[in-house]
Amino acid sequence: MNRCRLETIRAYWSGRVAAYSAVNADELGTIQAKVWDELIAEQLPWKHPLRILDAGCGPGFFSILMARRGHEITGVDYSEAMIECARENVENHSPEASAYFSQMDAQNLTFEDDTFDVVLSRNLTWNLEHPDRAYAEWLRVLRPGGVLLNFDANWHAHLFDPELARLYAEDAQTLRAMGYAVEDEHGDPIMDELIPQLPLSREQRPGWDKACL
């Protein structure tokens, strides 16, 4: 693994803690949080409290939702700043929660095999240098019969596919015509450098993920 690249990714997200946490906090106050909560709950057939790993937990959005349901949460993130933020957010939103947070690389977990009933992740795998290794680790720590739920997207595929670039531009134009502000994706020098180096930037998903699993 390129340790320098991993540290660059950590530094980038550590620098975005306050802004990203604010976005998550706003989302918790909208119908979108209920949609996420019910979507996940539909995939979990068990009624008893579950041991859940929130991989790449960030400021703790999924951890808060699952803690509210009484599950035992373990959140990991490579950014220590994100971990501290997640701890604080869970304490504020769900003070009675059973939640533990640890700074850890989601591609190299230190947990024993078959530790968790559920592995959750959102908007993480596109950041990873070795997403295939992350999937292998998540399956390793997932008990037999457990559930893996990963929510991610083709965030940057349009930068490498002309047809997707055309559709992206059309969508942006439509949104601007409707009065919405569309931010220029470029401009952050760290991401501009990292995106071409990350393997999932050029992959079509979820096709790649299904093949990997």
Predicted regions and their residues:
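A short glycine-rich, Lys/Arg-flanked "PGG" loop and its adjoining helix->strand segment in the class I
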Residues: 132-144
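Short N-terminal helix/helix-N-cap motif within the alpha/beta-hydrolase-1
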Residues: 81, 128-133, 158
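Short alpha-helix
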Residues: 200-213
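Conserved class I S-adenosyl-L-methionine
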Residues: 1-48, 61-65, 147-187
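Class I SAM-dependent methyltransferase SAM/SAH-binding core
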Residues: 53-55, 59-108
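A short SAM/SAH-binding and catalytic strip from SAM-dependent methyltransferases
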Residues: 118-131
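A short acidic, Gly/Pro-enriched loop at the edge of an enzyme's catalytic core
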Residues: 107-118
